[in-house]
Amino acid sequence: YVSWRIKAKDPKANIVVTPSDAIVLNVPEFRRVITQSLKFTSETDAIVTLGIKPNRPETGYGYIQADLSTSSPRNKEIFRIDTFREKPDLETAKRYIQQNNFFWNAGIFVWSVSTIVNAFRIYAPAISKVFEGLLNVYGTDKEQEMIDKLYPECEKISVDYAIMEKAEEIFVCPADFGWSDLGSWSSLLMH
């Protein structure tokens, strides 16, 4: 919904999507990585996700496998994604971190509004159809009423499954800025 809403206001916008339950300890490095990802997505039709360099085997996070042999010619710190991997068992997580091409999936995405809207048109057309049909009500008094009415008609699917795992122009920017998911009390105690 929000991508179409933003597109109605600024069709050239770039968007950063980030979970609200994470901590970032190195803000300058986070800013640098986000800035370079925004530059990349403003110049391409690509989607970028941030991949956190793992410091331990973790079974609570999904992983991103990057093809480190194919960095983007536009940015040597951004690589094509081979595959997304679901939350692994401990032995698999240990194997992942022994390699240098697996990163934690932090759920932080960067894309241009036109790229993500087009991706929904291709990979989740039923969802796209709902929000495309609302273009004339965004920013009006009818907007909330129509969202309340039509949103429940959308398939209940995460952006990971609907778009990220299917998209062809998908890249990862490996990052190390002191990220942690604070989704549990134990992770909060670590900080």
Where are these regions (language model features)?
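Conserved beta-loop-beta/alpha segment of the NTase-like Rossmann-fold superfamily
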Residues: 1-70, 118, 122-123
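Catalytic core of tubulin tyrosine ligase-like
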Residues: 61-191
